[in-house]
Amino acid sequence: MNAIILAAGLGSRFKDITQSTHKSLLDIHGTPNLERTLTFLRQANIDNIVIVTGYLHEQFEYLKKKYDCTLIYNEKYREYNSIYSFSLAQDFFNDCYVIDADVVLNRNIFLTKPSHSKYFTVIRSKTHNEWLPILNSNGQVIRIDIGSLNQPSLSGISFWTTQDCNIILTLLKEYTSEVRLKNPKLYWDTIPMEYIEKLNIYTEQLNSDDIFEMDNLDDYHHILQKLTPNKEK
């Protein structure tokens, strides 16, 4: 099994704090957040871990030796969206997790290997333009809506079987034109979303205290309060 971690972003909504520290490396009670995720992946015996870096890429160098992971530098992180980051790591996209680097985990969700592709979902306390998977009676995702309803939304972590990886990789070339890569409204997740009927993907809903979104300083401070050391699992 593999894991691709997308960590090229600027984190501009954090203002001054991310001028000197990448948002995925912000400290969570003594440990950079990304190291928490890497520790969980190693505990789950994930074979190959690749981190796609960009902004402040030099800050990730120490992770190569510490966690035996691969770093890929996206030099176009300022001009291209995450589809380009994903394309740089496509050789690893096989029986694979894809993880947003700024996701904060409070539990190791990687210990049981999924039997099929899945989106990990969560009901967020605050909702705004969330990606909401719509399921059929068998629990299979048949489409993804974008909205602010109080229902399970994509958490920033997904798993893809080899079969679905191959389908997505075949579609990837449709998204690598300059126009699409420079469109800030497109993400790597846009590819499976627009071709969901070709994929065999389900969901696993996490508890609200299993996973947190870290989009801005308010989120960060909220997470620090929620994850006091004696509350962590």
Curated annotation (Swiss-Prot):
CDD domains: PC_cytidylyltransferase
InterPro entries per record: CTP-phospocholine_CTT (IPR017189), GlmU-like (IPR050065), MobA-like_NTP_Trfase (IPR025877), Nucleotide-diphossugar_trans (IPR029044)
Catalytic activity: phosphocholine + CTP + H(+) = CDP-choline + diphosphate
Keywords: Lipopolysaccharide biosynthesis, Magnesium, Metal-binding, Nucleotidyltransferase, Transferase
Needed co-factor(s): Mg(2+)
Enzyme class: transferase
Biological pathway: Lipopolysaccharide biosynthesis
Keyword Lipid biosynthesis: no
Molecular-function GO terms, alphabetical: metal ion binding; nucleotidyltransferase activity
Pfam families (alphabetical): NTP_transf_3 (PF12804)
Binding site for Mg(2+): 102, 213, 215
UniProt key word Ribosomal protein: no
EC code: 2.7.7.15
Domain of life: Bacteria
Positions annotated to bind CDP-choline: 6, 8-9, 80, 85, 101, 187
GO BP annotations, alphabetical order: lipopolysaccharide biosynthetic process
Family in the record: Belongs to the LicC/PntC cytidylyltransferase family.
Designated name of the protein: Choline-phosphate cytidylyltransferase
GN (gene name): licC
